[in-house]
Amino acid sequence: MEDFVRQCFNPMIVELAEKAMKEYGEDPKIETNKFAAICTHLEVCFMYSDFHFINEQGESIIVELDDPNALLKHRFEIIEGRDRTMAWTVVNSICNTTGAEKPKFLPDLYDYKENRFIEIGVTRREVHIYYLEKANKIKSEKTHIHIFSFTGEEMATKADYTLDEESRARIKTRLFTIRQEMASRGLWDSFRQSERGEETIEERFEITGTMRRLADQSLPPNFSCLENFRAYVDGFEPNGYIEGKLSQMSKEVNAKIEPFLKTTPRPIRLPDGPPCSQRSKFLLMDALKLSIEDPSHEGEGIPLYDAIKCMRTFFGWKEPYVVKPHEKGINPNYLLSWKQVLAELQDIENEEKIPRTKNMKKTSQLKWALGENMAPEKVDFDDCRDIGDLKQYDSDEPELRSLSSWIQNEFNKACELTDSIWIELDEIGEDVAPIEHIASMRRNYFTAEVSHCRATEYIMKGVYINTALLNASCAAMDDFQLIPMISKCRTKEGRRKTNLYGFIIKGRSHLRNDTDVVNFVSMEFSLTDPRLEPHKWEKYCVLEIGDMLLRSAIGQVSRPMFLYVRTNGTSKIKMKWGMEMRRCLLQSLQQIESMIEAESSVKEKDMTKEFFENKSETWPIGESPKGVEEGSIGKVCRTLLAKSVFNSLYASPQLEGFSAESRKLLLVVQALRDNLEPGTFDLGGLYEAIEECLINDPWVLLNASWFNSFLTHALR
């Protein structure tokens, strides 16, 4: 169709049609039927006006040959085909000089003989249907409507056809020829069926009374009325305007808008250096759970009781020793801390009544691990105003780290299914309205796809740990409280299960401000040997604490059980967000919902059921070096959820900066893909802003690597 349009129509008409489509963000190469329709409409408008003049006596005459002596005025003013600003300027000028009523929409022509605006319609459907649509849209007695069809029919307001028979016959013959040409190339059926009802972007709402006065008062300086401002905005050419403004600013400022082409962007530079290390507040794929099914013990639901019950399920404890030391820490202190936990748990079991909470003895190893008395003394600023060389203490620049494969493995693992159910469907009342029914249906489908997902386990684990830590921080500010890391789930068969991942010991927690830090030591069970990826565990001291019997294809095998110990810290604001990690479910559900909405608007019906139940369809999940990865709708749900969860687990200023700055580049690339011919200035500065966020954070480095894959495939 595109080739046909370029052969069939005058190049000037083709160029005008392309410009009009680009103005509304449409691509002539994709929306070829619309391209053909716009060209046809333009040609009819030009043919309507051709050869019609008004002579010196004010009579309408037809002159087909150029007579240089004739002082003739064109009978019709052509409005269609001009850019919007110019078109409205012409309309305003006509209204001012002739006293004609200003139309709400841009008409196509103005007839100086009959003194009226004309709206031309070209339809592939019944002329009377199209005429009614036009009349309904325009709602104006003053604008004359004239409709032509490809079958030779026409219809005009009050059967007043404006032009002589011969001029109209020329237009009808041309339309019939276009139809024949299309049909001979097999294009007519698609073109005929593609016509939609009357649509408009050009509606001009009349603002009157108080709103009008408020509008006139709230204009930027130098604009006297709303109309002037509208005309200015309609004709605003951003590129030249920005260059002009910048050139006024300063001689040093030099911003030339450069075209952004497929060859323009380069990959984002990732830093070199030692591989990045794990920095989450708790273990993810490497975590090991000690679990009890159908818990019914005394005090079930009290964390300490649950923890002791879980600990009793394991019989392979052995004398612990360090297998991977922490480079900068005093490793014997980590070892002693674990031994102290075991001993104090044993003490509890020997008591007659197990207490609800356990405060650890303030031993030297725990004081060291929790940074007790390590904080520099705070001095009131007023007391040191007179000190001449007062300055903030020096802090080292963070060391650059390179991307490591473990973070991609962590993400892949987070997208996988586990054999447990981590979220229950909340009991919500009966649906009342149809929209509630659709919402419930979407929520149920989505929940079914993500309830077994490992990312959902991380959410529940994060919510539990942060809630417990914040509670303890407020309730036992001076105590080194022992906090079990617990989660609850259901097995496939629906049996309840309580899991213990390890323990946290919190330090002193007089948290006045949101950002005040509480230190804690985490001790987490794992079957992962830290010596396989020592760089991942840089911040940990790892002990071997037991041997676990595991069922495998060859029978029972014994595997060493490790304890990952590290000092960490968090704040009230971080714990508050950690407690709200369930929001990740909502965020990813909304992303899925927007995909369903897009599909539904195309099909003009709710597509929720088809969307989730059509298992054969695949959807884009993300970019990898291999290209665009695709998967089932369930995989899409779980991937979006995992991204949201990792944004929460690995939240950092580096991530905030990278997300904000890389988004700008992403928008420019998408504009290029949509053929919007974007321009940029100081692209180097944007790359600098993106790359200064790539320091050492594993999740940010992985996102940057994904962004590079996207660039590669988007610009092919």
UniProtKB/Swiss-Prot annotation:
The keyword Hydrolase applies. GO terms for cellular component: host cell cytoplasm; host cell nucleus. GO terms for biological process: cap snatching; DNA-templated transcription; symbiont-mediated suppression of host gene expression; symbiont-mediated suppression of host mRNA transcription via inhibition of RNA polymerase II activity; viral RNA genome replication; viral translational frameshifting. Binds 2 manganese ions per subunit. Phosphorylated on serines and threonines by host kinases, including human casein kinase II. One of its GO terms (molecular function) is endonuclease activity. InterPro entries: INFV_PA, PA/PA-X, PA/PA-X_sf. It comes from the Viruses. This is Polymerase acidic protein. It comes from Influenza A virus (strain A/Japan/305/1957 H2N2). The gene is PA.
